């Protein structure tokens, strides 16, 4: 009788694992919390203690770089401070994909959509149709630019 109870208990223990749902706690994280108002938390992907914090830089320029749509994007810079509430600084180098030639000095564009997740950012621009995806490693940021078939491919 005792062995039957132990066997039944072990079977129940192992079967309980098959009924458990795989829940990622990172799905509950919203990187936009604290990004507006005086918080100025940056929304881009980053690694814990990572050297780079890439994110879009919008016009007008808040400290964190990002503003909600429909504000236009000037480009993407590699270093942002988060939660300081001060003015923009650090002279970041801007990266901006464009597909309409080199005849303009600025290639500012509005976002068609935007997805912000923990460790990942993507947007597509309205005028150019270029999709930008960003993720990071501890010491580098990675970009993927997807251009429309018939456009020039410039950065």
Question: Language-model features: where?
Answer:
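Accessory carbohydrate-recognition regions in carbohydrate-active enzymes
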Residues: 21-155
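N-terminal signal peptide c-region/cleavage motif recognized by signal peptidases
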Residues: 15-16
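Enriched but not universal
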Residues: 2, 20-21
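Bacterial N-terminal signal peptides that target proteins for export
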Residues: 1-7
């Amino acid at each position: 009788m005792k062995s039957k109870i132990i066997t039944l208990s072990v079977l129940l223990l192992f079967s309980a694992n098959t009924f458990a749902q795989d829940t990622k706690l990172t799905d509950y994280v919203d990187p936009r919390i604290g990004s507006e108002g005086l918080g100025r938390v940056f929304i881009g992907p980053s690694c814990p203690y990572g050297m780079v914090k890439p994110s879009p830089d919008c016009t007008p320029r808040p400290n964190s770089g990002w503003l909600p749509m429909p504000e236009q994007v000037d480009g993407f810079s590699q270093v942002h401070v988060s939660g300081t509430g001060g003015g923009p600084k650090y002279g970041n180098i801007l990266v901006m994909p464009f597909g309409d030639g080199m005849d303009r000095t600025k290639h500012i564009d509005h976002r068609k959509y935007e997805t912000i997740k923990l460790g990942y950012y993507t947007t597509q621009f309205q005028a150019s149709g270029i999709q930008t995806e960003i993720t990071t490693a501890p010491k580098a940021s990675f970009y993927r630019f997807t251009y429309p078939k018939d456009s020039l491919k410039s950065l």
